Amino acid sequence: MEGLGIAAHTGPTGRVFPEMMKASPLLRAWLVRLQDAGAVLHPKHRWQGWNADGALVFDAPEGAVTAAPDGTVLALGGASWKRLGSDGAWAPLLAAKGAGTVPFGPSNCGFLVDWSNHVKEKFAGAPVKSVRLSVDGQETRSECVITQRGVESGGIYTLSAALVDGLRRDGTATLLVDLLPDMDVPAIVAKLERPRGKQSMSNHLRKSLGVSGVKLALLHEAVRGVLPDHPVTLARLLKAVPIKITGTAPLDEAISTTGGVAWDALDDALMLRQLPGVFCAGEMI
């Protein structure tokens, strides 16, 4: 990326991004490099498959055009972000030629939660910072963002595969949120056992452990009622607040997708076994 003149930075989840957080300058710089290397670009051409003679067919501004190259590399993307052209419309074209495909699904996406009206109205858009998120033994130290429909952000995307697996297996999945990742249960219990007098439990949590706002709302959401008074029970809840995931956000809102060309449809060189000379690359696999 930096070789293209675009400064990069690594985010908290280990992903690398353009420093300006825009992809278009990176794309323009890459296209210039390709053209400087002799590549000829044909914009506004939409691939339509093959004709009876095996030539590639495109819809172009001047009408249908064909090409019969010695080799073809397909890099057609997944099935999200339709407005930018990534719609997965190529999958039936390959399937018709006998190439194995897998149904598309969302990846690196938001997830649905049946929040109470209180959470939707008061905390939609709020980040839950400095927490540990876990799903079925996989975990990440990060943050998540509450949305009107559920949860999203980098920490959620890191666990998206595990969440999707749980949804496929059980119909729902459970995201556990450790609100106090730097404290163990005994340390939390010691704080909770301090006299609170006439303070409410919410005030006691705020003053003794700094748990307030959206974090406190997640606690109440988990119990859907009165918080437990027993220090050990409450401490364990603080270390593993369960959030019931009921589904994924719509496919077209996903950052990327699973599915596409099946791995067993390709040889070691990523050539389609059913279509010699046709190779696949990128998210379409």
Model-based region annotation:
Residues 13-32, 41-42, 81-86, 112-116, ...:
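Short beta-strand to alpha-helix junction loop
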Residues 71-117:
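Glycine-rich loop(s) and the adjacent beta-strand/alpha-helix scaffold that form part
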Residues 40-55:
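A conserved short coil-to-beta-strand element within the FAD-binding core of flavoproteins
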Residues 40-42, 102, 279:
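General small-molecule cofactor/ligand-binding pocket signal
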Residues 3-14, 71-75, 81, 132-278:
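Residue-level recognition of phosphate/Mg2+-coordinating polar/acidic sites
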Residues 283:
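Hard-cation-handling environments
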Residues 112-144:
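Acidic, Ser/Thr/Pro-rich intrinsically disordered regulatory segments
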Residues 4-16, 38, 98-107:
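A short alpha-helix-loop-beta-strand transition element characteristic
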